[in-house]
Amino acid sequence: MLNKLSAEFFGTFWLVFGGCGSAILAAAFPELGIGFLGVALAFGLTVLTMAYAVGGISGGHFNPAVSLGLTVAGRLPAKDLIPYWVAQVLGAIAAAAILYVIASGKDGFSAGGLASNGYGELSPGGYSMMAGLLIEIILTAFFIIIILGSTSSLAPAGFAPIAIGFGLTLIHLVSIPVTNTWVNPARSTGVALFADTAALSQLWLFWVAPLVGAVIGAIIWKGLLGRD
């Protein structure tokens, strides 16, 4: 079990460090900034690379919503759910803390949103709570369907990390303007702790929407689509 939890810790660490790091350090870099597309690709690449690296150990969840979805679908024992969540959140917090230290090394640094999520005045595009809730539930549900489908016995072997990574990239392309992309409660928690905004006051929704979406996605796959 320790090996699985370590894999989830380091996998989630890499997701936050690489994905949020790209947003904090590189997205708006003068003239050469990577923008929304670069950040979206970074998140997808973190999952793709670590799924290949440690997916065989823990399943490569790196996300409490994914772990819940796989539990509902019968892919993860219920007794492992909370330990997975703890490892994922700790990995996210560790990565966010190190990113904060690195970013604060620049003159004139201001924590600001620190790649945190939000709705209303914390939404990159000024979207409402209802808009954020709806898009995150839908996107998380489809993310779970992608994961369950690409890792099923019916899917071509060896390609699941690619499908999952590109799926997460697409999710970010759609939702960065709306919420800065939640779908992962651990990622949301890690950066919210260090953001100089009201992100913590909205953190409850960063958990509720992805977890609801995960359950919906698992039910859809298991009841309507799943054949494995």
Swiss-Prot record:
CDD domains listed in its UniProt record: MIP
Residue numbers marked as site, Selectivity filter: F43, H172, T181, R187
Gene Ontology molecular function: any one: water channel activity
InterPro entries noted in UniProt: Aquaporin-like, Aquaporin_transptr, Aquaporin_Z, MIP, MIP_CS
Membrane topology: Multi-pass membrane protein
GO cellular component: plasma membrane
Keywords: Cell inner membrane, Cell membrane, Membrane, Repeat, Transmembrane, Transmembrane helix, Transport
Top-level taxon: Bacteria
TM spans (from-to): 1-21, 23-43, 82-102, 129-149, 154-174, 205-225
Cellular compartment(s): Cell inner membrane
Role of this protein: Channel that permits osmotically driven movement of water in both directions. It is involved in the osmoregulation and in the maintenance of cell turgor during volume expansion in rapidly growing cells. It mediates rapid entry or exit of water in response to abrupt changes in osmolarity.
Assembly and binders: Homotetramer.
Family statement drawn from the similarity comment of this UniProt entry: Belongs to the MIP/aquaporin (TC 1.A.8) family.
Designated name of the protein: Aquaporin Z
Species assigned in the record: Brucella melitensis biotype 1 (strain ATCC 23456 / CCUG 17765 / NCTC 10094 / 16M)
Classification lineage: Bacteria, Pseudomonadati, Pseudomonadota, Alphaproteobacteria, Hyphomicrobiales
